[in-house]
Regions:
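Beta-strand/loop-rich accessory regions of lumenal/periplasmic or secreted enzymes
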Residues: 1-197
């Protein structure tokens, strides 16, 4: 069974009403600089190594070029026999870059993974500039309910200061995502960024 698809670097998010304020210049800059559609070229051939414990480590690197500047992304995946995967990503700016709305990865999960639980800020969506009014705890929801239906489609459903997130089907099978060092932010939505913009 396929549990994940289309892992790729992610430097764009659907603009919010706040981003569109001030004459819409920030959201326009993101689009003009092609943050939503970088040209991706291979920087390093894919290399796979079988480790002594039976795990397999795969490394690769690619360059994401924008209208102004680029970022080299280095990936290392280690896959274990129990089904767990260690994923490390490093983002190396190469030139003067525009203001980046986000830096991370996006991927597509099967529709059967319809439940989400996380330990972090919640239960409502939180952002770096809007999180202190929320509590840290363990929260449960469905993927469909992670999206808040604003009058104008925009970025939604982000959660800050997250230690772990579980994305599961109705039998409890799926993904547990944690950060090796520190906390992270995540969103799990039934829509792609392009559908929201």
């Amino acid at each position: 069974k396929e549990w994940i698809n289309c892992v790729k670097p992610h430097f764009f998010r659907a603009p919010t009403d706040n981003d569109k304020g001030f004459g819409n210049w920030l959201a326009k800059e993101w689009k003009i600089n092609k943050l939503d559609s970088p040209v991706i070229t291979q920087e390093k051939d894919i290399e796979a190594i079988r480790n002594e414990d039976g795990s397999v480590t795969v490394t690769t690197a690619e360059r994401c070029s924008f209208l102004r500047g680029s970022i080299v992304t280095q990936y290392q995946y280690t896959m274990y026999s129990d089904g767990s995967i260690d994923f490390h990503a490093k983002y190396i700016p190469q030139d003067s870059l525009p203001t980046m709305p986000c830096i991370g990865n996006t991927f597509i999960l099967p529709n059967t993974l319809s439940n989400v639980s996380w330990y972090g800020r919640g239960p409502m969506e939180t952002y770096p500039d809007r999180k202190t009014s929320s509590s840290i705890g363990r929260w449960n929801n469905t993927i469909d309910d992670q999206y808040f239906h604003y009058s104008r489609p925009q970025d939604s459903g982000n959660h800050e200061d997250v230690a772990e997130v579980r994305l599961t089907d109705n039998k409890g099978k799926g993904w547990l995502i944690t950060a090796e060092n520190g906390l992270f932010s995540y969103s799990a939505l039934p829509y792609s960024v392009n559908q929201l913009y």
